[in-house]
């Protein structure tokens, strides 16, 4: 299911012909944001509040990681393939740095299962299904992305920019804004994939 969500996240970027090869990095920073909240706030917050914060934090982290190369592409016409690919390695180093402080047990060089005793921050079962929330969230994003790309004005702008930026400018579409917005959406969804991996599946994080 997580792979499907990643594919959904990449859809608008690829439709715009922005070759986002940085999904791995966006997933890692989203997962790291989720893990940080589970570790530092898991035992001090009500579960619903913690879940919302984890979801929002992973979304924001992924969006930031997606917007960075989009800004450089929009204003300096950098190569997005290389830029997003290199950001993957930056994200890996950030997670590796965090693992040093989060390792459990000490000296293991792994985070281990986060909150294994309390299960704080773990997505609960839904309808008796362990991964029920994962399925529901992915289905919601699948349907939402279909509506967004097929029927919304922004989805139309993505398609036009992907076909021809000159045509988009002629149609008075703000190309720079479309690139940045679309990569924010793409990165944000990939960040949520990191949330599902950490909170809803493995309950740990690694590179």
Language-model segments: residues:
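Single transmembrane alpha-helix segments in multi-pass membrane proteins
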Residues: 1-41, 55, 59, 63-78
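Hydrophobic core segments of alpha-helical transmembrane domains in multi-pass membrane transport
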Residues: 3-10, 31-37, 58-64, 88-96, ...
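Alpha-helical transmembrane segments in inner-membrane proteins
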Residues: 8, 45, 64, 69-70, ...
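Terminal peptide-recognition signature
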Residues: 20, 66, 72, 90, ...
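Interfacial loop-to-helix junctions that mark the boundaries of transmembrane helices
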Residues: 22, 48-52, 122-134, 206
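Alpha-helical transmembrane segments of multi-pass membrane proteins, especially transporters
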Residues: 23-31, 50, 54-62, 80-88, ...
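Transmembrane helix-bundle core of multi-pass membrane transporters
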Residues: 80, 84-151, 178
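Helix-loop-helix "hairpin" substructures at the membrane interface of multi-pass membrane proteins
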Residues: 127-204
